[in-house]
C-alpha cells in the first residue's frame, strides 16, 4: 500500500469543447480562477488558497479525455505505484511520462475499468532539448 499521507487527489482534468464557456461556468459556479497554461490547449483553475488541500483543476480539449473527468492522485514514487496497480489487477494505460520542471504522470485502469491518473512531484525533470520555460 502506498503512503496514505501522500495519496491524495491533487489534479483532475475536465474535458471541454469550448474553453471560454467552460471557464466561465466553473468561475461562476465555484469562483475558480481560470488561466491559460503554456502554448498548448490547456487551462488551469485555482480551486483554493495554497498550501491548502485543494486540487488543481484543468480544462483540456475533449479529444484528450474522451471518457470524462480524469482524477490524478499524488504518489511518492510513481514507479512503485504503477507496480502496485499491476499487482492489484489494474492495467497501465500510459506509462511514466515527464512533465518538465514539474514531475511525472501516468494513467491506469482499475479493476472496474475506470481511468485514473498518477502524479509524482519532481521539479528536476528536465526540459527536452535543455530549453527553459517561460
Language-model features, listed with the residues they occupy:
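Core segments of cupin and vicinal oxygen chelate
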Residues: 3-6, 13-54
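Vicinal oxygen chelate
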Residues: 2-4, 10, 14, 82-83, ...
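Mid-chain, well-packed structural core segment of small domains
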Residues: 64-94
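Short amphipathic alpha-helical segments
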Residues: 8-12, 55, 67-71
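Short, charged/polar, Gly/Pro-enriched secondary-structure boundary elements
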Residues: 51-58, 113-116
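Short, flexible, solvent-exposed loop/turn segments with mixed acidic/basic and small polar residues
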Residues: 2-3, 58-63
